[in-house]
């Protein structure tokens, strides 16, 4: 266990700890990269050796099965660093958006072989056709791609194939 001294604990300390907690479905991304950390509050020690920590998170979508694992991962990382008094709070509104992902996280997705979300978030309008969305292949960078299935390896991804290099790949859906 890595104990923190009460006098040098800052929110930055907690952010650094949280940056070590990975998304169980995409292990190259931390919960910080994903943008699901909404807030961090330090609570006074009140007779304890270290202050308490409250971490607010927003699921990538309602009912995301990874959220229990993520909450447990956050809790365990905090405990490992001596923050035994911790609370994980779920905030549903406003809903998470791919706009909250870090640029570093998007680059990590691409390096991992998953096309990162486009910069535009939200559902397409009724007039917008799926074929108009140009998704770049994370292998060869071609935009000559086609969607194979609306659903990929997880609910937040679609399955695409590159027409140039012929490689299939997941695309992280915008929302």
Predicted features along the sequence, with ranges:
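Domain-level signature for proteins that mediate thiol-based redox and metal-cofactor handling
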Residues: 1-175
């Amino acid at each position: 266990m890595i104990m923190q001294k009460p006098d040098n604990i800052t929110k930055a300390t907690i952010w650094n700890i949280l940056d070590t907690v990975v998304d169980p479905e995409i292990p190259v991304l931390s919960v910080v990269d994903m943008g699901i950390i909404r807030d961090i509050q330090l609570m006074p020690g009140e007779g304890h050796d270290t202050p308490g920590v409250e971490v607010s998170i927003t699921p990538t979508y309602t009912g995301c099965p990874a959220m229990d694992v993520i909450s447990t991962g956050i809790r365990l990382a905090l405990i490992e660093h001596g923050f035994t008094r911790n609370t994980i709070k779920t905030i549903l509104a406003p809903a998470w958006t791919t706009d909250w992902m870090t640029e570093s996280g998007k680059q990590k997705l691409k390096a991992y072989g998953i096309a990162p979300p486009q910069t535009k978030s939200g559902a397409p309008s009724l007039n917008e056709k799926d074929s108009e969305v140009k998704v770049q292949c994370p292998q060869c960078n071609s935009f000559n791609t086609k969607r194979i299935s609306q659903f990929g390896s997880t609910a937040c991804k679609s399955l695409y194939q590159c027409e140039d290099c012929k490689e299939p790949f997941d695309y992280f859906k915008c929302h």
